[in-house]
Each structure stands twice: as C-alpha cells, then as structure tokens.
C-alpha cells in the first residue's frame, strides 16, 4: 500500500495531477477540496494516498490530509460506495460538512451530489452514523499551504478543464457546461471555476 507521497507537483489536470517523486511521475486523482489547496506547479507537495488495485488498473487517490484520506476509506467501506462516488461526495462538501450531515441526518446536501438520490442519501447517513461517532466536526488541519498562484490559464483552457472535472464527478455534460458558462468572471483559474460551479450546483 502506498500511504504517502512526497515530491514535486509536475502537472495539474483536474481532477488528476502528476507528482514527480525522484523522477518517477505518479498520476493521482484528488477530490476538488484537495485541488483547491494545491501549490503551484514546480512546488513541493506531500499527499496522503490510497491505492486501489483492480484487474485492469492500479488507481492512486490523494488527499491534503490524513484525516481526508481516512474519511475516504470510511466511505468506500460502505455498501454501494466506490471511489468515484466517494470522491464526488468529498468534492462537493468538506469533510466537516459531511460529518455535520451525518450527525444531523440531513439528506438535503447529499442529494445534490451526482449519483445520490434521496434513498441512497438516507441509507448512507444511517450507515455512517455509528461509524462516525468518533468523528467530531473540528477545524481541518491541512498539510498543504497554497503558494503563489500559477499564471492564469487561457480562458478556453480553464473552462474546458473545469467542465471535464465536473463531468468526471458524475455531472452530465450539459449540466457541467451550463454551470461553467454561468460564471461571469472568465479570468479565473480552472480550480476557481470548479469551486464556483460546484457552489452553484449544491
């Protein structure tokens, strides 16, 4: 199991990144909440990781903190929750927000996540309640501290990256395009476009 990687951020292509560790490039998929906290390309980066081995692929998921990684592991233990749905949940809501939903048994925020209907949300909250008794909603301690932002990407590229990232989370292409097109400030980075689009959808 690969539990942590430390190296240099070589590339960002939401929701994936390439982490260069001593010349070896690891492709890592991250939730949007981690993506927002990434440093600039070329800067050092440490990720807490979870490796999924399948017959046809080995998939590496990365998180800004051990707490996020552990939360992801709790989610994928649930019946019917795979890595894709777990990342969609963690991309739409911060860990503390998800914990509060569990504590309050509040389905409203969860049902806005792609792939989560009311019945699924209710089942997830019931299953999570006992597991998360030890999870208090406390201020998150993230390992990543944003450095100076990268130079703004070309508008068309940033919009395209944002749309692709939303589609990867399970949103329909039309929904993703509409959410990104609704953003008035076209000079934003792809990360900021994704953040605003998700806020508009949740």
Swiss-Prot record:
Region (Domain III) residue spans: 154-202
GO cellular component, as recorded: cytoplasm; Holliday junction helicase complex; Holliday junction resolvase complex
Keyword Nucleotide-binding on entry: no
Pfam families: HHH_5, RuvA_C, RuvA_N
Keywords: Cytoplasm, DNA damage, DNA recombination, DNA repair, DNA-binding
InterPro entries (UniProt xref): DNA_helicase_Holl-junc_RuvA_I, Hlx-hairpin-Hlx_DNA-bd_motif, NA-bd_OB-fold, RuvA, RuvA_2-like, RuvA_C, RuvA_C_sf
Subunit structure: Homotetramer. Forms an RuvA(8)-RuvB(12)-Holliday junction (HJ) complex. HJ DNA is sandwiched between 2 RuvA tetramers; dsDNA enters through RuvA and exits via RuvB. An RuvB hexamer assembles on each DNA strand where it exits the tetramer. Each RuvB hexamer is contacted by two RuvA subunits (via domain III) on 2 adjacent RuvB subunits; this complex drives branch migration. In the full resolvosome a probable DNA-RuvA(4)-RuvB(12)-RuvC(2) complex forms which resolves the HJ.
Function: The RuvA-RuvB-RuvC complex processes Holliday junction (HJ) DNA during genetic recombination and DNA repair, while the RuvA-RuvB complex plays an important role in the rescue of blocked DNA replication forks via replication fork reversal (RFR). RuvA specifically binds to HJ cruciform DNA, conferring on it an open structure. The RuvB hexamer acts as an ATP-dependent pump, pulling dsDNA into and through the RuvAB complex. HJ branch migration allows RuvC to scan DNA until it finds its consensus sequence, where it cleaves and resolves the cruciform DNA.
Family (UniProt): Belongs to the RuvA family.
Domain notes: Has three domains with a flexible linker between the domains II and III and assumes an 'L' shape. Domain III is highly mobile and contacts RuvB.
Protein name according to UniProt: Holliday junction branch migration complex subunit RuvA
Origin organism lineage: Bacteria, Pseudomonadati, Pseudomonadota, Gammaproteobacteria, Pseudomonadales
Gene designation per UniProt: ruvA
